[in-house]
């Protein structure tokens, strides 16, 4: 009967049944008959229509065998399916649905032996099935997802119904689940969007890796690396003889398992499971699929959040962040190193996205703290995150900080008067504050790796851009506010702006601004980890320029003391970390040009051979880089703070530290603004009524003089000893401020500004009797600064490893010739000396800077109003030269050199005398630069040299041209002024025809080799240029020259022509000149102390071309 039944069976069933060997019921480790299996595979490959019939028959037989617990038959069936999948991998789609149904039947049997036997079959299925089939058949997709879910449940550490099982049996179940997960993680189906099962398998993997032991992950990682190393050595080992007896002991049992206790054996088994879970995790992250890495990271972060919500500790925080550790930090760093280099950044981006999705609530602060900590650990590690958008991460962290500020705002909390609630609220606030501090440090960690040259500068700029002044601080900010009046006191809090849209865009509250400034400090500290005192000149990035701080001076006027101190800390950190010796070279800082301006300049340079008037029009349309006003505004704010917060000793100490650090790091670039302001502050001591306040302001002034003597190393000179002796005398008399010392104290040692300290126990009677001797020898002080500055530039380098002391480029961007560059590099520009010797007043400086900012806000128009810019540059007379803007603007605080403790009445009288001395006519070119009357008389002026005219026509303005006071750098003149060496050789103040001029006083030791210190208008009143026109008629075609003292630091045509003669004399013989002209005398000789302008004018022969067009005479050569 059985034979008849076998003959009636279809052939595919007969071939399948022949593969099952004869075994007893309950037998395990049964294998199919090899010859019959081979023929079945041949039959299936030659007849593809039979594949589905074979699968259906195996499914039916498996259900019967599982029901009857025929484990041997089930094992044979699974091995037949594995062989079919391997043999028919191109047609695996035909049998894949039946494989999934059979696996589902086996998994639901709840028999660990059969489930372990199904693992090779499932591995073959994952390796050979077509992932595209998942997109085509939704039923098949659901079957696949269900199988993955069932296998993943096996790996759970808290599976229901297994609590009563022994530890070895539990380990078997978890091993089976992890083996299946490893097969899934290496499959292509997992990489597809549809087949992604990260939310199913990742939690099971992480459950097997979770441990309260801090070093558990490190042990597993170390064991994994050792096993991989052994596997690699086996693959590279040469083939051995079959007769060789294996003696390496590689498969010997672990000694702990043989001699240890049951607890040791269980611990070893747990490690084995952990190693397998670690292999599964690695197989997920080593795949170069960005979507898979992102999904796995999101699942990991969700697991971490769940553990935090359950009260588990995933991170351990320390004051020293390098000691921070924990399970979350360890696993996050491990997966980051496993991920491909080009895809690592997705791990950090996923963490940031998860952080931003967490609602800003008190209950979620611990989750946010854990995520911020693991992000910081990754950012400051040696893992390179190529492709990461640093600015996007920065803005995301700033957004999270604003959410926390909104949570901490008073409007978001209610006070019900409950003591328990108040204590809980205090704890939450402390936790919130700690989280904000961690976010600040995380922002700083972004600077660990620099991926492009301007990254650090861009990060600092992005934060500064979001520091918005509040209503209260904007009232007090200089230069718009009043110096005195009903201002908010130092203890007043900033107006809290609770509008949600303002929170979304700016740090509107004082705590937010202080936090943003602390983040800037952290960025600068992290970007320069090994900063030396000599400056980090071997940087692979661009240093943060000074123009980044443009417009931030108002932060020093913030009513909140924490904001003021945070701002000072940021500035001092920038000075210490981002400046070098090159920052001490006297240079006019320029703000970066806009892209439209750069485009204009390119268009202008492309037409260099066009007519000069066309090229000039290009320059008029394109805006030039405007000078930076940061240092000028900063010293103005320091002046205001010194007088407003004189009641608080801490504020004055902090101001001393800031002023000292500016001088020590920027040298004369800071002293040009600081010295006039300090002398004005020293004069204001006389107007202060309280003796205690007088002592404090006087100590601040002498502390600045002390800093200058230390910086420029003239403390051994007479003025240096005078300064130190006065400081020592005041300290001895106890009329000094503790903290104003050299070197200055650290900012960490100083308290919060605005906090009242106990008043010093000073005797008021002795204060009235004692004298605070001011330091009046200002001119000698400036000369010492200038002399030491020259010596520092001329000094050779100290060692082969130190940077060269000579600057490599021209100073002030001047267009000097190659023969004059070496001298100009070691000479201090005249405008710096004038600033240090000039008068300074708060109101005039504020008005000048406000006018400059107002004119800059115009839409690129180059009209008459551009003369009121007052940019702190050598090219602008509006502020640095004669103190007038456009001839009739407000008086400059830097316009006078007589600021040696003079009374205010004389100062005002001189300012009134100065008004009206400069004609208000605007000059646009070299042909109209002689006098204002030239326009009305029809004379076009005189071209001093044909060389100058050739340079103008070719589009290259000569480096030495003329201009009257009131001209500026707006581009209206075809030839713009630049600093040149001839400025140092021509001193009109020493002319004999003006013996009574107060500006003709010689300064010892400098008149023979330095430029004029008095190129501003004479204080005693200058002759009117209109009256001077008819003064000399001996040379009719040549218009009379304006008074040289009225040029405000700019060159005259005679001066430019004289210097052009000198340059020609270096290149060609004087015999080649025309005999009609006279050879001018050189004014650069050391013997000639004065020069006669009339003799120089007579040297220009105008007779041969007296009646020519425009009175243009014959060139004198």
Curated annotation (Swiss-Prot):
Query: Where are the stretches annotated Disordered?
Result: 473-494, 601-625, 792-822, 853-1117
Q: An example of a Gene Ontology BP annotation on this entry? A: protein localization to plasma membrane
Biased-composition ranges, Polar residues, are: 601-616, 856-868, 982-1009
Compositional bias, Basic and acidic residues, is annotated for 908-918, 1076-1092
Cellular component per GO, a single term = plasma membrane
What InterPro entries does the database record attribute to this sequence? EFR3 (IPR039786), EFR3_HEAT-like_rpt (IPR049150)
Q: Which family does it belong to?
A: Belongs to the EFR3 family.
- The name under which this protein is listed is Protein EFR3
């Amino acid at each position: 009967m059985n034979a008849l039944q076998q003959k009636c069976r279809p052939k595919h069933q007969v071939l399948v049944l022949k593969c099952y060997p004869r075994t007893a019921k309950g037998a395990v480790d049964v294998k199919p008959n090899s010859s019959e299996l081979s023929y079945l595979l041949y039959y299936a490959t030659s007849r593809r229509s039979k594949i589905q019939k074979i699968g259906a028959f195996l499914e039916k037989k498996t259900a019967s065998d599982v029901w009857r617990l025929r484990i041997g038959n089930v094992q044979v069936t699974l091995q037949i399916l594995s062989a079919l999948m391997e043999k028919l991998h191109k047609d695996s789609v035909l049998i894949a649905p039946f494989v999934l149904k059979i696996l589902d039947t086996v998994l639901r049997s709840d028999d660990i032996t059969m489930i372990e036997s199904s693992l090779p079959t499932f591995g073959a299925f994952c390796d050979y099935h077509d992932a595209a089939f998942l997109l085509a058949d939704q039923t098949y997709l659901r079957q696949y997802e269900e199988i993955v879910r069932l296998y993943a449940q096996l790996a759970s550490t808290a599976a229901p119904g297994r609590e009563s099982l022994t530890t070895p049996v539990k380990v078997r179940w978890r091993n089976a689940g992890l083996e299946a997960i490893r097969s899934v993680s290496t499959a292509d189906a997992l990489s597809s969007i549809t087949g992604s099962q990260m939310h199913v398998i990742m939690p099971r993997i992480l459950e097997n890796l979770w441990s309260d032991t801090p070093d558990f992950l490190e042990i597993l990682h170390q064991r994994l690396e050792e096993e991989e190393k052994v596997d690699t050595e086996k693959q590279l080992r040469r083939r051995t003889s079959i007769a060789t007896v294996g003696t390496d002991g590689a498969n010997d049992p672990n000694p702990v398992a043989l001699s240890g206790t049951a607890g040791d054996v269980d611990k070893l088994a747990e490690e084995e499971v952990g190693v397998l879970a670690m292999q599964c995790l690695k197989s997920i992250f080593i795949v170069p699929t960005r979507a898979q890495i992102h999904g796995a990271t999101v699942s990991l972060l969700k697991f971490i959040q769940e553990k935090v919500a359950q009260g588990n500790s995933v991170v351990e925080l320390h004051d020293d962040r390098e000691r921070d550790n924990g399970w979350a930090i360890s696993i996050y760093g491990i997966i980051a190193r496993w991920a491909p280099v080009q895809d690592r950044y997705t791990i950090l981006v996923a963490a940031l996205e998860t952080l931003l999705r967490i609602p800003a609530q008190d209950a979620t602060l611990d989750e946010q703290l854990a995520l911020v900590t693991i992000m910081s650990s990754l950012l400051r590690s040696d893992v390179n995150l190529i492709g990461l958008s640093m600015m996007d991460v920065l803005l995301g962290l700033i957004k999270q900080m604003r959410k926390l500020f909104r949570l901490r705002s008073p409007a978001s909390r209610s006070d019900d008067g409950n003591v328990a609630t108040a204590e809980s609220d205090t704890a939450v606030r402390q936790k919130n504050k700690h989280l904000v501090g961690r976010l600040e440090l995380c922002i700083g960690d972004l600077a660990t790796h620099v991926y492009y040259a301007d990254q650090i500068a861009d990060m600092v700029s992005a934060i500064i851009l979001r520091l918005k002044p509040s209503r209260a601080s904007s009232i007090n900010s200089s230069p718009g506010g009043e110096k005195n009046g009903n201002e908010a006191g130092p203890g007043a809090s900033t107006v809290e702006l609770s509008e949600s849209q303002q929170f979304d865009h700016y740090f509107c509250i004082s705590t937010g601004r202080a936090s943003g400034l602390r983040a800037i400090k952290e960025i600068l500290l992290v970007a320069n980890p090994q900063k030396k005192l000599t400056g980090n000149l071997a940087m692979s990035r661009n240093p943060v320029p000074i123009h980044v701080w443009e417009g931030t001076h108002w932060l020093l006027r913030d009513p909140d003391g924490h904001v003021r101190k945070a701002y000072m800390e940021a500035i001092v950190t920038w000075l210490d970390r981002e400046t070098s010796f090159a920052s001490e070279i006297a240079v006019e800082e320029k703000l970066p040009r806009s892209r439209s301006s750069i485009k204009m300049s390119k268009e202008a340079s492309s037409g260099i051979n066009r007519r000069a008037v066309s090229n000039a029009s290009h320059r008029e349309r394109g805006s030039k880089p405007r000078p930076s006003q940061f240092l000028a505004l900063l010293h103005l704010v320091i002046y205001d703070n010194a007088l407003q917060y004189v009641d608080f000793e801490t504020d004055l100490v902090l101001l001393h530290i800031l002023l000292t650090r500016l001088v020590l790091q920027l040298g004369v670039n800071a002293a040009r603004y600081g010295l006039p302001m300090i002398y004005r502050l020293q004069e204001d001591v006389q107007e202060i009524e309280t003796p205690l306040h007088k002592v404090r302001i006087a100590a601040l002034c002498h502390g600045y003089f002390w800093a200058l003597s230390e910086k420029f190393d003239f403390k051994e000179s007479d003025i240096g000893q005078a300064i130190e002796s006065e400081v020592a005398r005041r300290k001895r008399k106890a009329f000094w401020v503790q903290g104003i010392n050299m070197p200055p104290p650290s900012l960490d040692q100083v308290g919060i500004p605005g906090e009242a300290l106990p008043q010093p126990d000073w005797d008021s009677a002795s204060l009235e009797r004692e004298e605070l001797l001011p330091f009046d020898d200002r001119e000698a002080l400036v000369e010492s600064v200038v002399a030491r500055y020259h010596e520092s530039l001329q000094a050779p380098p100290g060692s082969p490893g130190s940077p060269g002391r000579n600057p490599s480029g021209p100073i002030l961007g001047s267009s000097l010739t190659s023969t004059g560059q070496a001298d100009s590099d070691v000479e201090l520009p005249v405008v710096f000396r004038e600033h240090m010797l000039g008068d300074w007043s708060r109101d005039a400086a504020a008005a000048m800077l406000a006018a400059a900012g107002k004119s800059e806000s115009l839409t690129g128009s180059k009209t008459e109003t551009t003369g009121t810019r007052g940019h702190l540059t050598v090219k602008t007379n509006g502020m640095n030269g004669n103190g007038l803007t456009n001839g009739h603007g407000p008086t400059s605080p830097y316009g006078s050199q007589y600021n040696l403790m003079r009374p205010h009445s004389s100062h005002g009288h001189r300012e009134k005398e100065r008004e009206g001395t400069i004609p208000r006519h605007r000059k646009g070119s070299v042909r109209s630069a002689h006098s204002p009357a030239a326009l009305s008389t029809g004379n076009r002026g005189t071209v001093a040299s044909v060389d100058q005219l050739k340079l103008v026509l070719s589009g290259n303005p000569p480096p030495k041209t003329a201009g009257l006071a009131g001209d500026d750098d707006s581009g209206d003149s075809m030839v713009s002024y630049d600093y040149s060496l001839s400025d140092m050789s021509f001193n009109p103040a020493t002319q004999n025809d003006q013996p009574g001029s107060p500006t003709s006083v010689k300064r010892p030791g400098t008149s023979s080799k330095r430029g004029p210190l008095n190129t501003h208008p004479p204080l005693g009143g200058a002759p009117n240029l209109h009256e001077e026109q008819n003064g000399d008629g001996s040379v009719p075609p040549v218009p009379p020259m304006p008074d040289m003292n009225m040029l405000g630091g700019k060159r005259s045509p005679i001066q430019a022509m004289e210097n052009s003669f000198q340059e020609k004399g270096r290149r060609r013989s004087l015999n080649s000149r025309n005999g009609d002209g006279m050879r001018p005398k050189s004014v650069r000789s050391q013997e000639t102390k004065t020069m006669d302008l009339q003799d120089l004018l007579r040297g220009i022969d105008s007779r041969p071309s007296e009646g020519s067009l425009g009175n243009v005479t014959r060139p004198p050569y």
